[in-house]
Amino acid sequence: MNKKQRDEISKLLSYVLRHAPESMGLTLDRDGWCEVDELVGKANANGHSFDRQALEEVVETNEKKRFTLSEDGQRIRAAQGHSTEQVQVQHIEKEPPAWLYHGTASRFMASIETQGLIAGSRHHVHLTEDPETALSVGKRYGQPVLLAVDAKGMFEAGVQFFQADNGVWLVEAVPIEWLTKVADTVS
């Protein structure tokens, strides 16, 4: 399977497992899991041609580790990023590192400067330990801006942090007082 095919399957899995399982007639459990065989069967019935082996290759090679297979390999879920109401993944609460980062686009800064970071249609704000990863996320939406989050300060103030299966840090919101603009970059 080539990179283009893997990317197409990955985009489909992200859409279905994060946002619209009903688009293929799937039902996810409360933790976001569905049966691999059912997913592959319904994907093929909806015009997407891939098998279990291709799905497993996508899971294994995905750089951002967007998907998790159950220990027995029979179920799959998106690691984080859900917007569907029926999924309420119980991520493990953890103490974060002192600083985390969020990448956004300059066009969103006016809103961020008044509201802080909010989850929007997702369940959580996504943060990373790696500034470069945050910048690459910001580039997807326009001229990137790198924001630093005083995670230690937030945690000490009683804010809960969670970490998804793929290492992404999750928090309900980041009030403006915990944010610092690190850099504007020209793409």
Curated annotation (Swiss-Prot):
Alphabetical GO biological process terms: tRNA splicing, via endonucleolytic cleavage and ligation
Pfam families (UniProt xref): PTS_2-RNA
Residue ranges crossing the lipid bilayer per the database entry: none
Coiled-coil annotated residue ranges, if any: none
Keywords, ordered alphabetically: NAD, Transferase
GO MF term (any one): NAD+ poly-ADP-ribosyltransferase activity
Top-rank lineage group of the source organism: Bacteria
SUPFAM superfamilies attached to this UniProt entry: ADP-ribosylation
InterPro entries: Ptrans_KptA/Tpt1, RNA_2'-PTrans_C, RNA_2'-PTrans_KptA, RNA_2'-PTrans_N
Name assigned to this protein: Probable RNA 2'-phosphotransferase
Species this protein is from: Pseudomonas syringae pv. tomato (strain ATCC BAA-871 / DC3000)
